[in-house]
Each structure stands twice: as C-alpha cells, then as structure tokens.
C-alpha cells in the first residue's frame, strides 16, 4: 500500500478560492479572507510550470479528440496533479473522471 502524501494545492485552485473571497459581501469577506489565508499558508502551492503547460496541452487535446471537455481551470488542476503523480480530491468528480490516468476521490 502506498503511503499517503501530504495535501498540496494547485496555484489555479488558490486563484479560484481567492476569487470567491473577492466576490463575497462586505459582511462575509473579512472572515472568509482570514480563513483562506490560514488554510493556504498550511499547504504547499504547486505552480503552473512549463511541464504543467505540456501536460495541460496533452490532457486538453486528448479530451477534445474524444469529444469530451471540462472547464479550463479544471484542466489545469488535472494537469498539475498528473505532473506530480497526485490525485484530485473534489466534490466535482463528474468532470475529473473524464481525464485519462487521473485518480479522483471525493472527500468524506
């Protein structure tokens, strides 16, 4: 059995989370900002690199040629996970299970 890796997060996922904070109402924004800042500080952020870009292009082309497509940001998350040999933990399995070779689990 393979040992579990510590959680990591793709830079694009951090962008999506911060976008949610920026769209929050003035009432909710400070609390959400503090929570996200604390959460992000505890996780290594995986950058979008040249290798990620190549993996991104491969996944994009494979899905496109099979007539399937997922969101642009989801493609980047998938490519980042594949590049690092990681799995994706998401409530949105419907999109990610379409990516060949990507391991996907739903959190409990």
Q: Where do the protein language model's features map onto the residues?
A:
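PIN-domain endoribonuclease scaffold, especially VapC-family toxins
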Residues: 1-83, 98, 103, 108
């Amino acid at each position: 059995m393979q040992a579990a890796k510590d959680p990591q997060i793709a830079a694009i996922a951090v962008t999506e989370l911060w976008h949610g904070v920026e769209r929050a109402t003035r009432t909710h924004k400070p609390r959400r900002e503090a929570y996200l800042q604390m959460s992000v500080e505890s996780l290594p952020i995986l950058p979008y690199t040249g290798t990620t870009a190549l993996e991104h292009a491969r996944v994009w082309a494979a899905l496109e040629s099979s007539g399937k497509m997922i969101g642009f940001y989801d493609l980047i998350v998938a490519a980042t996970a594949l590049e690092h040999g990681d799995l994706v933990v998401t409530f949105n399995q419907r999109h990610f299970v379409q990516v060949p070779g990507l391991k996907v689990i739903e959190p409990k």
